[in-house]
């Protein structure tokens, strides 16, 4: 196997680089060969190596098993649904805190070093949670272990996106294809992961489901860490470079958040849409006497999203990020209103149809938000930026599920279906606040991005 360097970005005075996504707004730049959609996707294994796609997909699978696995484990072993819900929320809080921390460390010292520490810690945290829940440990111990499980969950999806940004400099269509693939992989994972938990818990036990997730994390998380595409830490900009660009852009959390605030808010709204929709669907199915089928009904949204995320690369270059964001978020709003009407009608068929339509607009918005996030962040902070977006989604899901549950219990199922429409409107507003063309930013030369052929 040989490693191939990516084209280097032109120099910029602040001592950083904005990566491939930043190249979308630069001119002039090398023209990317025009390829068909399938040919563009065919570039991905050539750039990263054939093993990268399955390794990265399986490595992210345990992440999608944590929330439902923790809920099921704690609820079953303690007999308390309330404690199970708290433990699940604690894992989400841990993820929201640990995700950006992992990303920032990966930016500084490289992904491999971070993952080689985080993966074993996550396995130990899962084992500790299983032990605590199974032996009747105090609630505080169980919740503490759940926080650690979330905090040490490897941020495979965001870190994989960082690798694609490095490998696709000056290749905007290939970058879009990579982001589309990543969103599809996420969607499939978030459908498959909970299904695996349910199957393993039914056949064996909730403990077996969580330990299976830990085993997959150990094997494929380490394989992801050791893969040649792992990005090294970026060299620290000189004092003069930081002064020229503003140290906040490279050093502080607040400085980076200021740069990527719009996509972070967009991802928060997207998470709220997911969480509130899931809760509303669960309430709908509970009213129908088939609560155990709520996951299958909600999965309809994920399948539609996975398909359209892959299709984003076929959109013309003239259909820019801001236009895509606003257009597809508007489609989300319309279809969320249809879901609201379907939820109020009591018709399962109508609800499934509305969710299928809703999912068609989710994928393109997700791809666009991650692409914009990469565009707005310096490459020296791309890991932190991507994990910020993922963490915002986790927080949004928890917020949407919490508020949705209260509305469903206090007002009714039909009212709960109004919350996804509100979240979709927030997505439109955040998209409108995005500048139509990012300010011109020069970029500096990056070290050769890893690639495997």
Residue ranges of model-derived segments:
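Helix-loop boundary and gating motifs at the non-cytosolic
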Residues: 33-96, 250, 254-299
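Loop-to-transmembrane helix entry/capping segments in MFS-fold secondary transporters
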Residues: 81-82, 170-183, 291-295, 379-389
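Helix-to-loop junctions at the C-terminal end of transmembrane segments
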Residues: 98-111, 201, 308-323, 408
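C-terminal ends and interior cores of transmembrane alpha-helices
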Residues: 120-136, 331-345
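Cytoplasmic helix-loop-helix junction between adjacent transmembrane helices
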Residues: 145-188
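Intracellular juxtamembrane helix-capping segments at the cytosolic ends
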Residues: 154-169, 281, 364-377
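C-terminal transmembrane helical hairpin of 12-TM major facilitator-type secondary transporters
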Residues: 323-369
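A late C-terminal transmembrane helix in Major Facilitator Superfamily
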Residues: 376, 380-411
């Amino acid at each position: 196997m040989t490693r191939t360097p990516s084209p280097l970005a032109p120099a910029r005075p602040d001592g950083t680089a904005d990566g491939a996504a930043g190249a979308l707004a630069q001119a002039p730049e090398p023209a990317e060969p025009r390829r068909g959609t399938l040919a563009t996707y065919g570039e991905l294994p050539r750039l990263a190596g054939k093993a990268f796609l399955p390794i990265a997909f399986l490595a992210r699978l345990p992440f999608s098993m944590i929330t439902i696995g923790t809920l099921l484990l704690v609820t079953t072993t303690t007999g308390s649904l309330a404690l199970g819900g708290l433990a699940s929320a604690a894992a989400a809080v841990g993820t929201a805190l640990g995700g950006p921390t992992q990303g920032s460390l990966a930016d500084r010292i490289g992904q491999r070093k971070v993952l080689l520490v985080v993966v074993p810690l996550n396995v130990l945290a899962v084992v500790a949670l299983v032990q605590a829940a199974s032996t009747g440990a105090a609630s505080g111990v169980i919740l503490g272990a759940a926080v650690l499980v979330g905090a040490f969950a490897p941020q495979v999806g965001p870190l994989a996106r960082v690798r694609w940004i490095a490998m696709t400099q000056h290749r905007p269509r290939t970058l879009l294809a990579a982001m589309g693939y990543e969103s599809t992989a996420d969607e499939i994972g978030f459908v498959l992961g909970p299904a695996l938990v349910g199957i393993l818990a039914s056949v064996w036990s909730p403990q077996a489901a969580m330990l299976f997730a830990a085993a997959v994390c150990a094997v494929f998380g380490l394989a992801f860490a050791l893969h040649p595409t792992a990005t090294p830490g970026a060299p620290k900009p000189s004092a003069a470079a930081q002064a020229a660009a503003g140290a906040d852009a490279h050093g502080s959390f607040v400085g980076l958040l200021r740069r990527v605030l719009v996509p972070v808010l967009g991802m928060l709204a997207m998470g709220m849409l997911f969480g509130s929709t899931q809760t509303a669907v669960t309430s709908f199915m509970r009213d129908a006497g088939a609560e155990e089928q709520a996951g299958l009904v909600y999965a309809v949204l994920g399948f539609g999203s996975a398909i359209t995320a892959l299709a984003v690369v076929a959109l013309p270059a003239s259909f820019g990020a801001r236009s895509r964001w606003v257009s597809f978020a508007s489609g989300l709003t319309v279809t969320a209103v249809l879901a609201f009407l379907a939820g109020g009608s009591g018709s399962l068929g109508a609800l499934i149809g509305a969710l299928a339509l809703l999912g068609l607009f989710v994928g393109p918005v997700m791809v666009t938000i991650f692409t914009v996030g990469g565009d707005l962040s310096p490459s020296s902070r791309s890991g932190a930026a991507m994990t910020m977006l993922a963490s915002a989604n986790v927080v949004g899901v928890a917020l949407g599920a919490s508020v949705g549950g209260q509305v469903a219990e206090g007002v009714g199922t039909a009212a709960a279906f109004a919350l996804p429409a509100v979240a979709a409107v927030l997505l439109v507003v955040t998209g409108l606040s995005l500048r139509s063309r990012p300010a011109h930013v020069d970029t500096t030369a990056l070290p050769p991005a890893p690639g495997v052929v």
